[in-house]
Amino acid sequence: MGLYFRVRKSDASARLSELKTKSGTLILPEFFPVYNPNKPVITPREMSEMGIKAIITNSYLIYRSPELREAAIERGIHSLLGFDGVVMTDSGAYQIYRYGRVDVTNSEILRFQHSIGSDIGSILDVPMSSEIGREEAESGVERTIRNAEEWASMREELSNTLWVGTPQGSIYRDLVIKCSERIRELDFDYNGVGSIKVALEKYDFVTQVDHFMSIRSILRAGKPFHFWGIGHPSTFAFFAAIGADSFDSASYSLYAEQGRYMTPHGTLLLDEIEEFPCSCPVCSSHDPKEVKAMSKEERTKLLAKHNLYISISEIKKVREAIRGEWLWELVQERSRFHPNLYFALMHLLRRYSSLLEAREPLFKSSGLQCSGPESFLRPEVVRARNRLKYIHYNGKFRRVLYGDVPLGLKYLYPFGQTICPYDEEVQDEPEDDEIITCVLSYQYEFPFPKLPAIMRRSKSTGTLREVSLEGKVIGHFRPNDGAFIPTLDGASLILSHLPYPKGRVVVKGLFSDTVARGTTVFVKFVKEADPSIRPKSEVIVVNESDELLATGKAVLSGVEYHQYHPDHPFIIIRRHVKPRSEEKPPEVDS
């Protein structure tokens, strides 16, 4: 099957998206708990009953057992495990890391994963620790590339399974780049990023950030990113915010064996707990004293179940934070419970500001909460300060995060939606022409001249509504974020001021008429786009002669859209210059 990956919503660098597999559609970000058939603490059937939609298991462990191998080939992996959700399989790469070798070739394990019906499979790459020597790392990279090339030569034979390609290289950035570039050329379905062993065990999150961001900057943005080995719920929000779409780990079980009780903020020792600070089914029906008195096997199973419930709850919260556009707030909250995670957050915001900003939505429906020094470095805050240079009005108000802000931006995100205890209420009201001129200059990163517009306000709340200029309605302001939504007349006015290709998406001639009649602008329709377009930007769609076709809202970034599937939506049309065709338009994904 071909890759179907569609972004529905963005926040930070996270994507609420749909991934179709032959066993069903996953909503990402998602956590894949590891199931070890040799140590079945919680069975896949029990996981399914807990609400888990996807799991990962080690195909090498199944392959190595004659009994399991025969059953998997005969019945399929889903039947063998008793799980009808999405099953991802690892290739045995972790065994290479732990033991130095596996008793199977890359081609054998690829064919085996395909034959047992894995939804998502992986090549035999070579995971590395942060303490590996340069020479050994080079050898591992060469082996990973050879195995990736072997997969590419077998692509047709292995169709109908989604395949993960994972670059390696450890802490040697040049090796990571070399491996990533080759993996990109081979065009896997799913991008993999291997967490750096040892460093992760030492809570060295900075090393993980640098490794992930190096790979993310090279691999195609239009594919999902799987971050191997990330399993503590306290880190899900953070790693989703930097662009990871899925995670896997056996930590829920390994921690349970050690008597460790997961929370969204860290880990507690069962021996030190007097009351369970959780209302999951396990904690609601047992108390710590009772669990401590159980046998090791019973205790481990209950703790593992609790740890899984917490992991499920947290990944749901991450998805909800993306929907509500408050993911950075969740990241900031979680990072304050571990100094290494907070240090990694500050490192991320300082070092990768441009890469983060390129995917950050321009507007959000949720307010921005200033909670510490990291708030000054958030990508939307840095962008907002940078865009103020396009505005030349004397009236100002002061904001801690932004400095002096033109009064005309009083109601625009993020200035009017920032919650900071040191900011005073702004009493002054901007003039109508001040609002429209400042907002357009900010929105389109271009200094507009003074526009003598007239505003219509809500009689009950005073909220800005319609905007008129010379007797024509040119647009309206969206109440929750103050963004200007142009009409077709407004779009024509904006085009008359903006230099080409500012604010525009240019559609190829073949697709001009269908877009002019209201069809979504798909990636394959686009000839050129303003690279400063961000998710939720208000965009003007034109033909190759720079004639207005439509207005709409961006789903993707202007610097990443071309890396997505040709059928992925880029601009959702709001208004169009021609009536919709009487014929039924082609079915599109909006």
From Swiss-Prot:
Residues given in the record as substrate binding sites: 125
Cofactors, names only: Zn(2+)
GO molecular function terms attached to this record: pentosyltransferase activity; RNA binding; zinc ion binding
Record's keyword annotation contains Chloroplast: no
GO biological process: tRNA wobble guanine modification
Enzyme class label: transferase
Claim: Transport is one of the keywords in the record: no
HAMAP family: TgtA_arch (MF_01634)
Function: Exchanges the guanine residue with 7-cyano-7-deazaguanine (preQ0) at position 15 in the dihydrouridine loop (D-loop) of archaeal tRNAs.
Protein name listed in UniProt: tRNA-guanine(15) transglycosylase
Species per Swiss-Prot/TrEMBL record: Korarchaeum cryptofilum (strain OPF8)
Lineage, uppermost ranks: Archaea, Thermoproteota, Candidatus Korarchaeia, Candidatus Korarchaeales, Candidatus Korarchaeaceae
